[in-house]
Amino acid sequence: MAMGVSLTSHNNPLLRHLSPSSSWVSRSSSRLSSSPLPSFLFPCRRTLLQRKLASTDGNVGYCTTTVCQGFQHSVHQRSSSVVFNGEWELRSESNKVRMVPKIIKVGNQTEVAETHQVPGTVSAWREEANKLRERNGQIARNLDDNGYFNGSVPIISSAPSYETSQKIDYEFKPRGTTRSTTATLNKELIGITQSEPVVSLPRKGLDVGDNMDVNPKGEGIQRPLISDKSSGTANGNKNTVAISKVERSTEPSNVRENLGKIYDKVLIVDNVQAAKDTVAKLVNQFRNHVHSCDTEVSGIEVKEETPVDHGELICFSIYCGPEADFGNGKSCIWVDVLGENGREVLAEFKPYFEDSFIRKVWHNYSFDSHIIRNHGIEISGFHADTMHMARLWDSARRIKGGYSLEALTSDPKVLGGTQTKEEAEFLGKISMKTIFGKRKLKKDGSEGKIVVIPPVEELQREDREAWISYSALDAISTLKLYESMTKKLQLMDWHLDGKPVLGRTMLDFYHEFWRPFGELLVKMEAEGILVDREYLAEIEKVAKAEQQVAGSRFRNWASKYCPDAKYMNIGSDTQLRQLFFGGISNSHDEVLPVEKLFKVPNIDKVIEEGKKTPTKFRNIKLHRISDSPLSTENFTASGWPSVGGDVLKELAGKVSAEYDFMDDVSDISLEEVVEDDDVETSETQKSKTDDETDTSAYGTAYVAFGGGERGKEACHAIASLCEVCSIDSLISNFILPLQGSNVSGKDGRVHCSLNINTETGRLSARRPNLQNQPALEKDRYKIRKAFVASPGNTLVVADYGQLELRILAHLTGCKSMMEAFKAGGDFHSRTAMNMYPHVREAVENGQVILEWHPEPGEDKPPVPLLKDAFGSERRKAKMLNFSIAYGKTAVGLSRDWKVSTKEAQETVDLWYNDRQEVRKWQEMRKKEAIEDGYVLTLLGRSRRFPASKSRAQRNHIQRAAINTPVQGSAADVAMCAMLEISINQQLKKLGWRLLLQIHDEVILEGPIESAEIAKDIVVDCMSKPFNGRNILSVDLSVDAKCAQNWYAAK
């Protein structure tokens, strides 16, 4: 629908502040472009002036000042609480006013210039239609029959109060003509908001939420422009136009009315006989249909608890499409399993859910599957997960829009073209808060601002009709979403290793890869992994004791300069900032006082002056402990110096927390805290570090505290503070979560949720996040030891070697990298040798060797290893190998290395000298991302990018365009390897099961006696993951070990 308008001044004095000067009216005109444009947007034909207003109901409201060519009356003014995306005009006729939509002429066609959505009820539309019929004898069909009415809008004298949007044909007569013209006004959900008169063509790929630059046109005279405020002018002659989404009306009364339409189509199954009859139809009459299913659950904190062995199924719904009739026009099934005979009713559906022939579609299959499995039913016939289909269609929605059923079905881009007129009124999942939310009562009985939702069991019993409709809508929306995603994926070509797969689409990819992968992930979640909770409890004691020691060490050091620091809260950024940066000014010229009082818990029961007994809290005075404020380049959003981990590490440098002032720091003994002698203390606590003589390892605090012993002491003390933070992270993120009952089932195994919800396709995990285990060198408490095999079993842990670098070598066709991988050995040492001539010369002269494989009895190499003799060069080579694969630039590397950008660029150029294919490939991907808006992985999954609006965003897109094919292709390889392992019949017969995938490694569990056989099979599956082949131009290196716990297998 065309979106052209023209601009004039207002006759209404209340609206004049929205217009430019009344002496200036744009007369610019241009033809509509014949070039292909997005279906939801056409170029502006005339000028538009809109001003964004505040909203009272959470929707976006607009006031528009515009008039159609041929009319001379100002636009109708809407209130700010109304979603208004169109243009109306008030026409004066015999002292009465008639509201008509604005039109334009395009050739011989007359079109409504814009679209709108106005509030009201269906009955209000029907009433106006009947009035029209009575007055003019024209046809006005009942809106319940999906109709619309013809004729002029009824004469009105004030703003209408409709609360729904319908497709309506209007008849009107443009000024100066005698012939009536009919135009159709359709409800649309996309519109333009602009803050100045413009004529512009939208860019390719314009999307909801995007901005585009526009230029004012007209008579070439610069005029004041309306800004986002009620007064003021826009700067310059360019402004931003935001493409905005107009939401459906979510007034509770209107929502419930629409839900009522669903209720009439729902068959309620709440007894055993009805269950038997329904199941008979499902497995026979409608056996060949696609069935969408959804559950409703009580007794579970979804964001905190695993659904494995948690949650109680209270009802579920099944929908096979509108053509499936279960009697009296009922097309959707809603099953009540909350009542007294609920378990018996559910048991009748067991054959249905376990029928592998019946194709079942779910939204978030993982959750529903575990909930139903909790009741002794193993689901078969998994056909699709619409959440995964949507992620495959557009991986960028994770950041903007999301993948919830509500977000997807409310988005016109997602369901566009798959809805009937009637479905458009109610399809689109509505949040529970909108339907069932009630304002929490205050103590005085009045309503507060907080909206709460009653327990779902209460809703099912007491608000039954609305609850049934809400539940059934999930299944209906899921099937419509499946139909839409099926069509969208069918329109996406499938590319394998950069080449199109003839006659195949991404829907084929989904069914061949992501559908079985999604089912495999659910099985892995159900398996879980056993954790040794006794071990976790023991290392928790050790960690807390070491944290207490490190904290006391820091406090006692700080108290030498500020006595009250002994009582400070070292977890408070405010107190630490006062201690390190007191007296400094921020970017807003606000000064942090040199000293300040803080209230802290009175742990030592100190009786303050003037008090007779100790109070719960006491005041302490903190002041800056250095002679001058410490320097830093890191600041918070408010302009104050940051005291985060990076800043503290910069102050401390690369020194140990251990120092000879330990003796007078604390009398806490680890042996007193940890009673079990078998528990190992951390490596750093076992031994003290010798006093360094080389001051280059010390941080900026060394100079700030005058150097010498005083400066060293400061750095070691701040390192102790870093240790406190590090230990706290290990306790809160790893040790404690693994012990929680919320993440484990009845068998004591941890069941995390595995998700394909990253933009590259990498797996993520939550409840708990097992993907985020600490690096081995930072795992001071050996947390991986807690992941163990059950009695009689063992673990096989298999890990890819340098997977992403091998992917990069294949994608780019880089000969140097492929030769290095073919030669084997230390890849990073070979990179350093190729980068630095002096390193190569040392290797060629035999002064160093790349790697060494000792023979029995040999304890050291004949000459130094390259990694020992040229450690600095190798470290830079290693960093570059990974950084360039991730799209990092010389600017970022200069910050990491603390060198100039020029020096970093010179090192980067050394890396590229022998790898020109990589640079060429990267430039192609950058261009592809900007011009086409997406890049592809090895198996053809796409990552979309928005149009870049700034240099920073463009740089981010270009880095992602380099990283995504590498990291996404690595995810493709890992997925294929897991599928190969899962279908291997020998592993199944031996009793081996996949438990986890953590980045590039997989963990399996099975009988001890077949461990070596299983390990060899796993290595073979991973090295040839593509149906028993390796399609890459480099070998896939796999290292595997058998052990009783994860740590021992590393």
Curated annotation (Swiss-Prot):
In residue numbers, the region (Polymerase) covers 717-1048
Disordered: region residues: 202-240, 673-694
Main subcellular localization, coarse class? plastid
What family does the entry list? Belongs to the DNA polymerase type-A family.
- Activity control summary: Not inhibited by aphidicolin.
* Family annotation (CDD domains): DNA_pol_A_plastid_like, DNA_polA_I_Ecoli_like_exo
According to UniProt, the reaction catalysed is: DNA(n) + a 2'-deoxyribonucleoside 5'-triphosphate = DNA(n+1) + diphosphate
- Show the disulfide pairing: none
Entry keyword annotation includes Nucleotidyltransferase:
yes
**Tissues expressing the protein:** Expressed in shoot apical meristem.
**What results from gene inactivation?**
Retarded growth and reduced levels of DNA in both mitochondria and plastids. Double homozygous mutants polIa and polIb are sterile.
Keyword vocabulary terms for this entry: Chloroplast, DNA damage, DNA repair, DNA replication, DNA-binding, DNA-directed DNA polymerase, Exonuclease, Hydrolase, Mitochondrion, Nuclease, Nucleotidyltransferase, Plastid, Transferase, Transit peptide
UniProt name for this protein: DNA polymerase I A, chloroplastic/mitochondrial
Q: What cellular-component terms does GO give this entry?
A: chloroplast; mitochondrion
Organism from which the protein derives: Arabidopsis thaliana (Mouse-ear cress)
Transit peptide stretch: 1-91
Domain (3'-5' exonuclease): residue spans on this chain: 312-490
Q: Where in the cell is it found?
A: Plastid, Chloroplast; Mitochondrion
**Lineage of source species:** Eukaryota, Viridiplantae, Streptophyta, Embryophyta, Tracheophyta
Question: Its function?
Answer: In addition to polymerase activity, this DNA polymerase exhibits 5'-3' exonuclease activity. Required for DNA replication and accumulation in plastids and mitochondria. May be required for DNA repair in both organelles.
GO BP: any one term: mitochondrial DNA replication
What's one GO MF term for it? DNA-directed DNA polymerase activity
Enzyme Commission (EC) number? 2.7.7.7
Which stretches does UniProt call biased (Polar residues)? 228-240
